[in-house]
Structure formats: structure tokens, C-alpha cells
């Protein structure tokens, strides 16, 4: 069970990493300088590439990824599942 939870967290982290890479590519594609994830999300919102709801969701995913990276063993799997089921 512990290994399964670990794989779940790693999968979430990788998905968010890939998503943030796509965000950075979109920022570059519209001719702007790529910065940190949160700034990149704000730039896409400002230039109407994404909606406010999409920006909020991307920020939530990014926070979740950061929590996974920094507090890997302290995150409750149930909490992660609830957050993703909402979306």
C-alpha cells in the first residue's frame, strides 16, 4: 500500500511538471519571457490564453505539486483524491 501511495504522488508530481512545462512553452510562444510557474500562469491569464478558472486550477495543481515535493510523506492520499475529483 505504501508503494502504491508513493507511485500515486510521483504520478501527480510528473503530471503537474509536464503541465507547467506546457505553460512555459505557451508563454514563450506568445513572445514573452518565461519566469516562475505562478508568473507564467498570470501572463497567460493577462493575455487571454487561459480563463480565470483555468488559472486558479493551474495554481492549485502547482501548490499540490510543491506540497508533494516538500512534504512527500506527510500528505494524505485521501486529500489528494478529493482535490482532483472536484475538477
Swiss-Prot record:
A single Gene Ontology MF term assigned here is: RNA nuclease activity
A Pfam family the protein falls into: HepT-like
The protein's UniProt keywords, in alphabetical order, are: Hydrolase, Nuclease, Nucleotide-binding, Phosphoprotein, Toxin-antitoxin system
Q: What is its EC number?
A: 3.1.-.-
Gene Ontology CC: toxin-antitoxin complex
Spell out which residues are annotated as carrying O-di-AMP-tyrosine. 72
Motif RX(4)HXY motif is found at 65-72
InterPro entries assigned to the protein according to its UniProt record, in alphabetical order: HepT-like, HepT-like_sf
Functional summary from the UniProt entry: Probable toxic component of a putative type VII toxin-antitoxin (TA) system, probably an RNase. Probably neutralized by cognate antitoxin MJ1547. Neutralization may be due to AMPylation by antitoxin MJ1547.
Protein name listed in UniProt: Putative RNase MJ1548
> What species was this sequence derived from?
Methanocaldococcus jannaschii (strain ATCC 43067 / DSM 2661 / JAL-1 / JCM 10045 / NBRC 100440) (Methanococcus jannaschii)
Upper lineage is: Archaea, Methanobacteriati, Methanobacteriota, Methanomada group, Methanococci
